[in-house]
Design a protein with these regions (language model features):
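Short helix/loop capping segments that flank catalytic or ligand/cofactor-binding pockets
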Residues: 60-63, 126-127, 169-171
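Active-site proximal loops enriched in glycine and acidic residues that flank catalytic Cys/His/Asp
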Residues: 15, 52-57, 61, 76, ...
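A structural signal for short secondary-structure junctions
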Residues: 43-45, 108-110, 126, 151-155, ...
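C-terminal hydrophobic structural anchor segments
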Residues: 96-148
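Active-site lining segments that contact anionic ligands and/or coordinate catalytic metals
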Residues: 48, 92, 110-113, 122, ...
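Protruding loop/beta-arch "assembly-hinge" segments enriched in small, turn-prone residues
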Residues: 150-185
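C-terminal structural cap/anchor segments
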Residues: 53-118
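Alpha-helical scaffold segments that mediate packing/assembly in large oligomeric complexes
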Residues: 1-43, 67-68, 83-85, 90-91, ...
């Protein structure tokens, strides 16, 4: 969300916001909210080629249908195993549901925060790692396991510490819309 970043722009700087649950069912409900985000981008000459949402909206998407009764989020599993990220489609575009995208709701008049996802032109975002992944292996350290100090050597254990530094650069924050749910807890 732009905290502790060396970059001048981050995704939360977008001025385009749509609150999920504000479009009445007769006008499309959550489907209408998703399309409202598309409209904000198109009116600004931007495109929408994908979505990223937090798992807190999964029940909302799975229970939402358009005016013809078709499901809003169509899951497109790529394999038979459970994935960390759930791939799917929203209004004909790639969508991913995962963990770690939400921000807390800040009570007030009106409430703020409550970001649950983003839609936009993901070619305007790049990510990478600095220096790859570094790791250390130890059989002699003492670590805390379930609140107790445990000797790796005495218990025939191995500890592996892996570290990586990742970065996300947003080229054009106007190419994104954030979706919020100010009622989320």
């Amino acid at each position: 969300h732009g905290t502790n970043t060396p970059f001048a722009q981050w995704i939360d700087q977008t001025t385009k916001t749509v609150e999920l649950g504000t479009t009445v069912k007769a006008n499309g409900g959550v489907y209408g909210d998703i399309v409202a985000g598309l409209k904000l981008l198109v009116q600004d000459g931007k495109k929408l080629n994908g979505f990223a949402f937090d798992r807190v909206v999964e029940p909302t998407f799975l229970s939402a249908v358009d005016n013809n009764g078709r499901p809003l989020f169509v899951e497109t599993p790529l394999e038979d195993t459970a994935s960390v990220v759930t791939p799917g489609r929203l209004i004909g575009r790639s969508a991913y549901i995962g963990d770690g995208l939400t921000t807390a709701v800040v009570p007030g008049t009106p409430n703020t925060g409550g970001i649950v996802g983003y839609g936009g032109d993901w070619s305007q975002a790049v990510w990478g790692t600095v220096g790859g992944i570094s790791y250390d292996v130890s059989t002699q350290a003492t670590v805390t396991i379930n609140g107790a100090l445990t000797s790796l050597w005495e218990n025939n254990l191995v500890a592996i510490r892996a570290e990586a530094e990742f970065g996300l650069l947003i080229n054009d924050v106007a190419s994104f819309v954030e979706y919020t749910d100010h009622t989320a807890s």
